[in-house]
From Swiss-Prot:
Localization, UniProt: Cytoplasm
Organism of provenance: Deinococcus radiodurans (strain ATCC 13939 / DSM 20539 / JCM 16871 / CCUG 27074 / LMG 4051 / NBRC 15346 / NCIMB 9279 / VKM B-1422 / R1)
NCBIfam families: lipA, PRK05481.1, PRK12928.1
Residue positions binding [4Fe-4S] cluster 2: C86, C90, C93
Cofactor(s) essential for the protein: [4Fe-4S] cluster
Protein name: Lipoyl synthase
All copies of domain Radical SAM core, residue ranges: 72-290
EC number annotated for this UniProt entry: 2.8.1.8
GO annotations of cellular component type: cytoplasm
Family, as annotated: Belongs to the radical SAM superfamily. Lipoyl synthase family.
Catalysis performed (reactions): [[Fe-S] cluster scaffold protein carrying a second [4Fe-4S](2+) cluster] + N(6)-octanoyl-L-lysyl-[protein] + 2 oxidized [2Fe-2S]-[ferredoxin] + 2 S-adenosyl-L-methionine + 4 H(+) = [[Fe-S] cluster scaffold protein] + N(6)-[(R)-dihydrolipoyl]-L-lysyl-[protein] + 4 Fe(3+) + 2 hydrogen sulfide + 2 5'-deoxyadenosine + 2 L-methionine + 2 reduced [2Fe-2S]-[ferredoxin]
SMART domains xref list: Elp3 (SM00729)
């Protein structure tokens, strides 16, 4: 009898029509370079306390990010807006899938802004689940959160890693005009692997068109995208993806190793060595990106603040207003 590939099984059903993926992590042998330390420390504990007290969701927890210990111990976190239930079911993602039925926490923008103040953050990354159940995909809520942060913390830089909003450029503009400093939308993988890696409603070309629109509409805003490696892509496909991103006006590109969250997700096809990640970065920099961050444990928001911080006086003219030098150092 042939056994079914666990990655093809449907997520488990739980109450209220919400589907939850198996929360038991995969126990697979990984290369030495993928080992991380267990999260500890006073700052890590304080950040976790603030997140819990304000009923916030972080992508650090929901997506089982391997950098949670390092980032939280630095006193920074990526906030995940609009709940922890995503309307899409990408086969790489550990976030729960279901129908949030239009529910939103209207106090969330203020709660996030207050948390940023309490944590004394100088650079904040906001992301969210996909909310196809909302007419605007959550764009207004996203923009409201950015504005709330800027009102309470006017010097704080804000990066918005948004859904594709179904390609609705009016929704993209709503976020762009909220005061955001960096606009990101993740390509996730190369063209050939977009399906089955991403939800069927996601599109390689749509993501590129959203990023291109963002750069055309607001040249002063940094544009950014991220890809996972180890899903079966070839080096030539990676080069093609980099060229596509550059043609769309993307400023910053990140590459990281795909890690399988549970047995319900796609398996890892290959572990890419740190040396190969370095080679990919060099190829990307030769294409003219502002920065290419490439490494096994890199995620789209990993050390995002340093992209600007490490370049005092060296930003292109259209981004020179973001030159904050050492002022962007986190607590």
């Amino acid at each position: 009898m042939t056994q079914q590939d666990p990655s093809t099984k449907e997520p488990k059903f739980i109450k209220n029509g919400i589907y939850r993926k198996d929360s038991v992590p995969v126990r697979e042998k990984k290369p030495e370079w993928l080992k991380v330390t267990i999260p500890t420390g006073q700052v890590f504990t304080e950040v976790r306390k603030i997140v819990k007290e304000h009923r916030l969701h972080t992508v650090c927890e929901e997506a089982m990010c391997p950098n949670i210990g390092e980032c939280w111990s630095r006193g920074t976190a990526t906030f995940m807006l609009m709940g922890h239930i995503c309307t899409r079911a990408c086969r790489f993602c550990a976030v729960d899938t279901g129908n949030p039925m239009g529910k939103l926490d209207l106090d969330e923008p203020r709660s996030v802004a207050d948390s940023v103040r309490l944590m004394d953050l100088k650079y904040v990354v906001l992301t969210s689940v996909d909310r196809d159940d909302l007419p605007d995909g959550g764009a207004y809520h996203f923009a409201k959160t950015v504005k709330a942060i800027k009102e309470v913390n006017p010097q704080t830089r804000v990066e918005a890693l948004t859904p594709d909003f179904g390609g609705n450029t009016a929704c993209v503009d709503l976020v762009l005009d909220s005061g955001v400093d960096t606009y990101a939308q993740n390509l996730e993988t190369v063209r050939r692997l977009t399906h089955p890696v991403r939800d069927i409603r996601a599109s390689y070309d749509r993501t590129l068109s959203v990023l291109a629109h963002a750069k055309q509409a607001r040249p002063d805003v940094i544009t950014k995208t991220s890809l996972m490696l180890g899903l079966g892509e070839t080096r030539e496909e990676i080069r093609e993806a980099m060229a596509d991103c550059r043609a769309a006006g993307v400023d910053v590109l990140t590459f990281g190793q795909y890690l399988r969250p549970t047995m319900h997700h796609l398996p890892v096809e290959r572990y890419i060595s740190p040396a190969e990640f370095d080679e990919i970065r060099e190829e990307g920099m030769q294409l003219g990106f502002l920065e290419v961050v490439s490494g096994p444990l890199v995620r789209s928001s990993y050390k995002a603040e340093q992209i600007v911080m490490d370049r005092p006086g060296n930003l292109p003219e259209h981004l020179s207003h973001l030159d904050g030098g050492s002022e962007l150092t986190l607590i």
